[in-house]
From Swiss-Prot:
Classification via Pfam families: TPP_enzyme_C, TPP_enzyme_M, TPP_enzyme_N
Family: Belongs to the TPP enzyme family.
SUPFAM superfamilies the UniProt entry points to: DHS-like NAD/FAD-binding domain (SSF52467), Thiamin diphosphate-binding fold (THDP-binding) (SSF52518)
Cofactor note: Binds 1 Mg(2+) ion per subunit. Binds 1 thiamine pyrophosphate per subunit.
Positions of the UniProt region annotated as Thiamine pyrophosphate binding: 438-518
Reaction it catalyzes: 3D-3,5/4-trihydroxycyclohexane-1,2-dione + H2O = 5-deoxy-D-glucuronate + H(+)
Gene: iolD
BP GO terms, sorted: inositol catabolic process; isoleucine biosynthetic process; L-valine biosynthetic process
GO cellular component term, pick one: acetolactate synthase complex
Phylogenetic classification of the source organism: Bacteria, Bacillati, Bacillota, Clostridia, Eubacteriales
Cofactor(s) essential for the protein: Mg(2+); thiamine diphosphate
Enzyme class: hydrolase
Residues binding Mg(2+), per UniProt: 489, 516
Organism of provenance: Clostridium perfringens (strain 13 / Type A)
Protein name: 3D-(3,5/4)-trihydroxycyclohexane-1,2-dione hydrolase
Length: 639
């Protein structure tokens, strides 16, 4: 079949399907693009001439549209994607950050950036990078470190092997992440006689591999000698749809479950054995039990530093680790005994073996007591008010900063109380989306939901700017559910362009913007380690040339109203509840500008985080922080 490379690519993508548990569905929903000279007359011509069943989406920022695509794939449990195409140069470079975000989170993302001419005839073309030591290097080489597969199509016939391998990676639960196929602009338009079999319908089967028997037997021997195990529920539980199997396993043997950011909402928050979030951003209950556990069973988790508290959380000297993971790489962390396979079938097999050996944990009232303690703390957090008895959760190191914010903005809302009002007001099955700042910590600790896949957190790359774009991606995946972006003012300012795309697609999203006039989370980290506030609050430059002037007030509601969103500016809890109720009635996207007091986010619960503190300083507070770091490091695992 004679056609251009661009036309062949479109036809190929339109014929890709996946099958999971007997359900077959189309894999590629469409293509996001911001057309430029390096893509519009090649791949762009193909999409105009015959897109097949592929939808063409128009992005506003290349990073933003790629975040939309990542969230779309995540919310579809990695079984549907939207590809992303861009022009050469800056358009391609803008997608590098999004590629890293997808790869870190093991989410399939297909990137199709335009590239400079394969023939080099017109070199240097507009937006081309020239390196004197290698003329073959282009901007697209920057994708290599952040992608799971990378290729460049220098001849039309190379498209075939490249796309077969792209699909191999995108549909492999153990290897998936970002894939970059660089498309030189001249090759996009070159015609070639492609074989018809390249365009046949391809069904990529996502299977449930079962680990070898020896791995189960060795795990059985370990578990039978342990009395107080815990389960860590990671993102792999969600993508395998193994939540029910994991709950059955936990109930059978009375084992408590702790959640990672990616694993949250795979099982019900209300379940008696669900302790909630674990680690640096974990809650009191999970971290209390984790401290004394003698066995950690990690299911579908990659054991990030936040989950393990930089490998210091599990303090029992007899603690061992078992992992159930489809990836050998992630399964081997923490010197764990590996069960390599699908979470659901492996948990079911392990359960049958433990049943046959009459295993049961020896917990008595520890789980109930831990949950009771956290319930009391939750009650306290959601009822913190800015009144005569107010005490900030984070002790302010800058005197008067909370009062200054309140006087300037009129804001009287504490962040933890705001989250309590939001949770009780929005729909039970609403999806919340987050990524960066203090909100992921507050949400992992405080957010409770029994609705499956309703907690959408990107905390692998914790990419500021993901939130609003991802809210649109989640809405495209599940248009019948309300979706809420939980975003700070810092992340909003970094990237909010896809609000316009949401308006264009007529997909209602809700943006809950927590404005505390700064990068509050990093300000806390900075000042808790003995450093003064420097460039983490949004302040004017003062007469001494320093960023020490007054806070910069921003009317975010007014900005968003210019885009056509229904907006609200709230300064009290009563106003917040009223705005949330009204927003539910709207047909268009909404933004609620919530003026939240600084230092009213949650702090940690018996968890340490290893950060690179200066080993020598003239500041006493920094030296004390370094000494504390060294003390904690001695108690942590080395790898």
């Amino acid at each position: 079949m004679r056609m251009t490379t661009g036309q062949a690519l479109v036809k190929f993508l339109d014929n890709q399907y996946v099958s999971f548990d007997g359900k077959e569905e189309k894999f590629v929903d469409g293509i996001f693009t911001i057309f430029g000279h390096g893509i519009v007359v090649g791949l762009g011509e193909a999409l105009y001439e015959n897109p097949g069943e592929l939808k063409v989406y128009q992005g506003r920022n290349e990073q933003g549209m790629a975040h939309v695509s990542t969230a779309f794939a995540k919310q579809n449990n990695r079984r549907k994607i939207i590809a992303c195409s861009s022009s050469v140069g800056p358009g391609a470079a803008n997608m590098v950050t999004a590629a890293a975000t997808a790869t870190v989170n093991n989410i399939p993302l297909l990137l199709l950036p335009g590239d400079s001419f394969a023939t080099r005839q017109p070199d240097p073309v507009l937006q081309q990078i020239e390196q004197s030591y290698n003329l073959g290097i282009t901007t697209n080489d920057a994708f290599k470190p952040v992608c799971k597969y990378w290729d460049r199509i220098n001849r039309p016939e190379q498209l075939m092997s490249a796309m077969i391998n792209a699909m191999r990676v995108l549909t492999d639960p153990a290897e998936t992440g970002a894939v970059c196929i660089a498309l030189p602009q001249d090759v996009q338009g070159e015609a070639y006689d492609f074989p018809e079999y390249f365009f046949k319908k391809r069904v990529h089967r996502i299977t449930r591999p079962l680990a070898v028997q020896e791995e189960f037997e060795e795990a059985l021997d370990i578990i039978m000698n342990k009395k107080k195990p815990i389960i860590i529920c990671g993102g792999g539980v969600r993508y395998s749809e193994a939540g029910e199997a994991l709950v059955d396993f936990a109930e059978e043997f009375n084992i408590p479950i702790c959640e990672t950011q990616a694993g949250k909402s795979a099982i019900k928050s209300s379940h008696p054995l669900n302790l909630g979030g674990i680690g640096v951003t974990g809650n009191l209950a999970a971290n209390m039990i984790a401290k004394d556990t003698d066995l950690v069973i990690g299911v579908g988790t990659r054991f990030s530093d936040f989950t393990t508290s930089s490998k210091s959380l599990f303090k029992n000297p007899e603690v061992d680790f078992i992992t159930v993971n489809v990836s050998k790489f992630h399964g081997g962390k923490m010197d764990a005994h590996k069960i390599i396979g699908d979470a659901k079938v492996c948990i079911e097999e392990l359960q049958a073996m433990l049943e046959a050996n009459n295993y049961e944990s020896s917990y008595e009232d520890e789980i109930v007591n831990a949950k009771k303690a956290w319930k009391e703390e939750m009650k306290r957090l959601t009822n913190i008010k800015y009144d005569e008895n107010f005490e900030a959760l984070i002790k302010p190191k800058r005197e008067g900063c909370i009062e200054e914010f309140s006087v300037l903005t009129g804001g009287l809302i504490t962040q933890t109380a705001a989250l309590g009002v939001i949770r009780e007001t929005i729909d039970d099955d609403a999806i919340v989306v987050g990524a960066a700042g203090s909100l992921p910590g507050d949400l992992q600790r405080m957010w409770e939901t029994d609705a499956r896949d309703s907690y959408h957190m990107e905390y692998g790359y914790s990419c500021m700017g993901y939130e609003i774009a991802a809210t649109l991606g989640a809405k495209l995946a599940e248009p019948e559910r309300e979706v809420y972006s939980m975003v700070g003012d810092g992340s909003y300012l970094m990237l909010h362009s896809e609000m316009v795309t949401a308006m264009q697609e007529q997909k209602k999203i809700n943006i809950l913007l927590f404005d505390n006039c700064g990068f509050g989370c990093i300000n806390n980290l900075q000042m808790s380690n003995g450093i003064g506030s420097l460039a983490t609050e949004f302040r004017y430059r003062d007469e001494n040339g320093k960023l020490e002037g007054g806070l910069i007030p921003i009317d975010f509601a007014k900005v968003a109203s210019g885009y056509g969103l229904k907006t609200y500016s709230v300064k009290t809890l009563a106003q917040l509840k009223e705005a949330l109720e009204d927003a539910k009635k709207q047909k268009v996207s909404t933004l609620i500008d919530i003026k939240v007091l600084p230092k009213t986010m949650t702090d940690g619960y018996d968890a340490w985080w290893h950060v690179g503190i200066a080993g020598e300083s003239e500041i006493d507070g920094v030296n004390k922080a370094f000494e504390n770091k060294e003390k904690n490091l001695k108690a942590a695992r080395r790898y």
